[in-house]
Amino acid sequence: MQINRREFLRISGAGAMTLFLSGCGLSALLGSEENKAAGTIPEKGSISGGKAMKIVVITSSPHPKNESTSYYLADRFTEGAKSAGHEVFTFDAANSDTHPCRGCDSCHMDGPCVFKDDIEQTLMPKMLEADMLVLVTPLYYYGMSAQLKTIVDRFYSRTSKLNHKKSVLMATAYNSADWTMEALVAHYNTLVRYMDWQDAGQVLAIGCGSRSLVESSAFG
């Protein structure tokens, strides 16, 4: 079914979602647990377990915020989550002081990392206390952006401490072929399995090559 921006905001606040955007038109198969009143904290049985969550949203587009398609979706998700009573922290991986993991193993997978950058000092404490992690990326060569991959690789320093969280994948792509997101979703699903996360949903926007296309779509 087609749903509009208000529905997206409501769903993002209410819990699990499986959304697929084609040509910036939104199609979704939604269970009854997602059909909660707008602006309410999810009822018991939804993805939140009936309580307000701490959510970390990690954006990773190198484009300016006002031009980024993926950032637009992240903003809409954040708006819906906050309106439902959840606490949201957003980290901009593309415009922060970050360093890729160098494989030194000084952390022994239990921290701290040798890099005292924004990942270690700002993002990691928020992720450790979060109930849900939201990974937001433009699709680059059929995978996540290098900026997001840098964050994911740095999970190594706290692997076990980041286990057992809920997660969401949000991605935008110019290509509109039905196989466009297959490689990214496969990577994400593998990450979910390895980290023992609970997948709370995916927003996969194909055929959305510009900010204006997204803004003039069901989300506008």
Regions found by a protein language model. Give the residues of each.
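N-terminal secretory signal peptides and thylakoid transit peptides that target proteins
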Residues: 1-16
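Hydrophobic/aromatic beta-strand patches that form the interior of the parallel beta-sheet core
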Residues: 56-58, 89-91, 168-171, 200-203
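N-terminal beta1-alpha1-beta2 submodule of the flavodoxin-like/Rossmannoid cofactor-binding fold
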Residues: 24-136, 142-158
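Charged helix-capping and loop-helix junction motifs
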Residues: 149-156, 182-187, 217
